[in-house]
């Protein structure tokens, strides 16, 4: 499913607000639709490694004193909407996925494309790196996940079991398990070694938009268009907590904070919420961006200042002060909705990706 049509068929309502954290897609579908990046392709195309040069460019960004991010490069290479951008845990690579059915791996030293992972029959909605940066798992509209060995560009396993678009995925910190969420409304847990599904959680009553492990892998959080954020015990598959406000707009994204104590959720009512999930309460709410159509990634940035980062449907990337909730910067340069973003694990750097016809990845850096 192409991110450019990843939107619900209901109009989400507005939500409420209130302390400390550390730190897409397009197809004709029955479901309301966060999802994927479909387009028809030959069955099982070969996996290829395609080196590509990229041309850095510059652009404008509007700055409110605080974060100091500036555009340093624009990367081109994908032919359709960007669905996800993620730095490798080692910080040496940037992965990007797209409706064009591929994942590309860019070397951060010169922004050259080192590898292109192919094999999916339809668009790739999401992907995740293993902890050692040597494997990638992908989630696709073709209802499968695939695990690739990055150094050899080898497709190691295909994970089958979901009955609708696979929209989101993540490795646990030990890289022994993969969690996935789907338009079939389920969350599945997979054994990486065998490629078998070890648990199927009847998680939600609408498509699952995001899944994430906590820092030790003992818990999973999932978000859905049913408006719920749920926390699951990884070992037994039991739901240990459901987070919901008085208003429950569709949940577009969820992620544990780096210290594992909080959950950041993105909601289709133009808000981000920081939850103390132990107490089941919203601590903070971040506003100012536009998000009522697409599943947009949000991030904690803890390498410099403590920021919350998110793309926006107004073609910008927004940076909030985590504690004060103020917008400290908005980054301009993309020409379409920015649904993908990530923060570098060691440097004050952001990667962002936009819908078609923009199709670009942009790299932003702060020297503050």
UniProtKB/Swiss-Prot annotation:
One Gene Ontology molecular-function label: RNA polymerase II-specific DNA-binding transcription factor binding
Entry-linked Pfam families: Beta-prop_WDR5 (PF25175)
Region (Disordered): 1-64
Domain of life assignment: Eukaryota
SMART domains: WD40
InterPro entries per record: G-protein_beta_WD-40_rep (IPR020472), WD40/YVTN_repeat-like_dom_sf (IPR015943), WD40_repeat_CS (IPR019775), WD40_repeat_dom_sf (IPR036322), WD40_rpt (IPR001680)
Coiled-coil portions: none
Keyword Hydrolase applies: no
WD repeat intervals: 77-116, 119-158, 161-200, 203-242, 246-285, 288-330, 333-368
GO biological process: determination of adult lifespan; programmed cell death; transdifferentiation
PANTHER family (UniProt xref): WD REPEAT DOMAIN 5B (PTHR22847:SF637), WD40 REPEAT PROTEIN (PTHR22847)
Name of this protein: WD repeat-containing protein wdr-5.1
Organism whose genome encodes this protein: Caenorhabditis briggsae
């Amino acid at each position: 499913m192409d991110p450019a049509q990843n939107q619900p068929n209901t109009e989400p309502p507005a939500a409420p607000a209130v302390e400390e954290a550390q730190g897409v897609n397009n197809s004709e579908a029955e479901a309301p639709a966060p999802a994927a990046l479909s387009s028809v392709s030959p069955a099982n195309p070969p996996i290829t490694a395609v080196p590509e040069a990229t041309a850095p460019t510059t652009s404008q960004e509007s700055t409110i004193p605080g974060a100091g991010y500036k555009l340093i490069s624009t990367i081109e290479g994908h032919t359709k909407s960007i669905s996800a951008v993620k730095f490798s845990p080692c910080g040496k690579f940037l992965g990007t996925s797209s409706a064009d059915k591929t994942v590309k791996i860019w070397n951060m030293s010169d922004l050259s494309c080192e590898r292109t992972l192919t094999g999916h029959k339809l668009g790739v909605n999401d992907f995740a790196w293993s902890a050692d940066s040597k494997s990638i798992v992908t989630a696709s509209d073709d209802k499968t996940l695939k695990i690739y060995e990055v150094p050899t560009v080898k497709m190691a396993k295909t994970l089958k079991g979901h009955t609708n678009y696979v929209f989101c995925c993540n490795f646990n910190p030990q890289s022994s398990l993969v969690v996935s969420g789907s338009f079939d409304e389920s969350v599945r847990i997979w054994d990486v070694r065998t490629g078998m599904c070890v648990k199927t959680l009847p998680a939600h009553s609408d498509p699952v938009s995001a899944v994430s492990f906590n820092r030790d892998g003992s818990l999973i959080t999932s978000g859905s268009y049913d408006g719920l954020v749920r926390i699951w015990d990884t070992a037994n598959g039991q739901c240990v907590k459901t987070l919901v406000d008085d208003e429950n707009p569709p949940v577009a994204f969820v992620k544990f904070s780096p210290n594992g104590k909080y959950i950041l959720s993105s909601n289709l009512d133009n808000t981000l919420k920081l939850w103390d999930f132990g107490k089941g309460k919203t601590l903070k709410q971040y506003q100012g961006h536009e998000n009522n159509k697409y599943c947009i990634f949000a991030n904690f940035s803890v390498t410099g200042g403590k920021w919350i980062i998110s793309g926006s449907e107004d073609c910008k990337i927004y940076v909030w002060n985590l504690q004060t909730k103020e917008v400290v910067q908005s980054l301009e340069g993309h020409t379409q909705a920015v649904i993908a973003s990530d923060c570098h694990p060691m440097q004050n750097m952001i990667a962002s990706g936009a819908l078609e016809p923009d199709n670009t990845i942009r790299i932003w850096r702060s020297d503050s």
